[in-house]
Amino acid sequence: MVKINGEPQDAAGQSIAVYLGAAGYDSRAVAVEYNEAILSKAQYAATQLADGDVVEIVCFMGGGC
């Protein structure tokens, strides 16, 4: 399981980009912290989620994510 925003999620094996799209996030309007490191948007497609990972997704509000 991957902990995303404090909640366990069955997302191992997906890239950050795939997870964001499936969860309905606009990748242009979020910041992602992955195992205590901020990812650049260029890293979203190449970063694969694995069991034990901790991810925080922060939305920039201005109309919602």
Stretches with model-predicted labels:
Residues 1-65:
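Ubiquitin-like/PB1-type beta-grasp interaction modules and other compact soluble beta-rich domains
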